[in-house]
Each structure stands twice: as C-alpha cells, then as structure tokens.
Amino acid sequence: MPLRTLFLNPPSFENFDGGAASRWPATREVESYWYPVWLAYPAGMLEGSRLLDAPSHGVSAGETIEIAGNYELLVLFTSTPGFASDILLAHAVRDRNPNIRIVFVGPHVTALPEKCLRDCPAIDFVCRKEFDYSVVELAQGKSPEEVLGISYRKNGAIMHNADRPPIENLDALPHVTDVYKRDLNIAQYEIPFLRYPYVSLYTTRGCPAQCTFCLWPQALSGHAWRKRSTDDVAGEMAKAKEYWPDVQEFFFDDDTFNIQKARTIELCAKLKPLKLTWSCTSRARGDELFSGKAGCNNCHAEPLWTEPGWNLHQPSEVCIDSFQADRGPDMRYRTSPIGALSTHFKAASITTGASLI
C-alpha cells in the first residue's frame, strides 16, 4: 500500500487564487477559483489519497493541520506569493504530525529548489516540473536516489536528481474529473467569464510558444507540446456530463488548445454529439475553431491571448476581423491583449492595440 497521501492546495489570504489552482495567481475583483488540476493527476493514481482545495472550500489553516494529522505524506502546491505562509503551515503540520513526509511542488520550487529547501527545514522533498510520477514513486516507497526530478537532503547536503522527462503518454494519466467528483464540490468554483457552474481540465500539456507572460510552460510543463487522444478526451467529457448534468460550461485550460489544426477539428467533431457548451484557451489563430470545418457550434468563449512586440509570432494573428467573419452565430470569443511588459516596443504596442479595436 502506498503512503496515505494528502494533496493540498493550501489555505491563503482572503480570496487569493494561487498555487495549484491558477495559471495567474491573483486576488481578483470578485471571488473566483480555478480547479487544482495539477494535483488531481497523482491523486487519481494513489489509493487512499485525498485532494484538499482549501481556498475554494473555505478550509482554514487550523482545520488543514488537523486533517493532515491523518496522513503519512503531504504534497503541497506552493506559489511565489504564498510561499512564506506555506512554510509556516508546513512547520505546523510537522509539529502536529512529526512522522509525516512533506513534499512541495509547483513553479516556485521548480525555479528555486535549493533555496526553498534551505528556507524551510520542514520540506523533505521538492518535486520539480511535472511531478505526477515523482510524487507517486515517493508515496510507493521508492528510494529518493532513484526518483527523477526531485531535490532533497542527504547527509546535510542538498541533492538534485536528474530532471524527469516530460510525460509523453497523457492518455495513461487518470481523468481529473474522477478526482473532482470524489473530493471537490464544483459549486465552489466560479470564474466571471465562464458560465456557472463550470469544470476545467486539460487536453494537452506544454506549449512551443515563448510568451513571456505565461506561467505553466515557462516553469512547469515546458515547451514540448503533448496531446491526449481525441477519443480519451471525448470519453472523459461524456463521463463528466453524466457526473454533473447541470454544468453550464466545460473549459479546456490548455496552454494553447489549437496548436494542431487537424487535431482541433477532429476533437470538435467528437465533442459535438455530446451537446456540451465548452470553451478553451487559444493562440490568436482560430480559423479551425470558428470556421464550419470544426462544426463546434457549442464553443462558447475563446480567450485569445495576444502579446505585442517581442514575442508576436505573426502580425496577422492579432487581427480580429477574420474571427468576426468566420465565427458562427452561437460562438463568442474574447481577447486578452497583454501590454506594458518589459519586452514591448512602444510602436508594436500601438500597432497591436489598433488592430484589436
């Protein structure tokens, strides 16, 4: 039997959506939370585990410490804004449960594994980058020296094992919606631009683009684009519809949903019979989504991320006229242009801004 494992998106300051839940850790104008999808994958692989999303479910630090007292392994997804409070929580958990092993995961510890281990003696392991199988192997008792992608202490020194390669077979991973159904209350999740209640998940990992504003590819999933099969995605969506018949929108929170045009069209065709309302995060190149080829009449909202200047891939990609011309009457999109970054040139920002008006 593996160690009894608690996967934790830790409690934080009021209305802060960070750590495991958010691509953009933030306190927003209205209280809103994303799903802790990264923690759901390994949670689905370990018998007896639990995924605790403290911020969205209103679980206090004191309650979290008591819950952690019943587990042998704690996997905490930290963030840069929340790291200081997460250190305090880790020490409190260790005081309550001296035998528990504590693992920190997420972009912050991936970028600064040695510093994080030195700053917090309560941390036993840091799992860098994609941590799904690293966490599972630790829970199953594999020797730390044999686990790829981790940093840890040994004889007073901090050791850094070789990186774990990006996961290629995404179909082998559990369906996160099974873990959501088991451990989470979907009524606790709301995002202003999505219909309520919503459910979010991934169909791909990684992104070859080098956009400076995007967290996951830069510090967690990397730039190697990997995809689930369209059959696997459609199967999970059919099951999710049975789990939650009242869900108003399913959101594919991929770094870039529409990188491969043929796959996008194929997946849209398999989703159409399910009669779902769904949306996705996309590069600002959506002809396959908005044209009749995809037949995705239930594609509700398309966040189109555009960064002017330095990392603009094609100038035409931020021209919205083509979307207006190609989209069907039941399709909606929104753009999120990014401005005032250190990489931007004034002229490029002005030109890009004009094309979005």
Question: Which functions belong to the PLM regions below?
Answer:
Residues 139, 215, 241, 300-303:
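Protein kinase-like catalytic domain
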Residues 8-10, 54, 79, 107, ...:
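Cofactor-binding loop segments of dinucleotide-utilizing enzymes, especially the Rossmann-like FAD-
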Residues 38, 42-169:
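Glycine-rich beta-alpha loop elements in corrinoid/cobalamin-binding modules
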Residues 2-32:
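Short glycine-rich His-centered loop
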Residues 72, 124, 212, 248, ...:
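Conserved acidic residues
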Residues 288-357:
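Electron-transfer interface patches adjacent to heme c in soluble/periplasmic c-type cytochromes
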Residues 176-287, 291-294:
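Radical SAM [4Fe-4S] cluster-binding motif and immediate context
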Residues 2-3, 144-147, 153-200:
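N-terminal [4Fe-4S]-dependent radical SAM core
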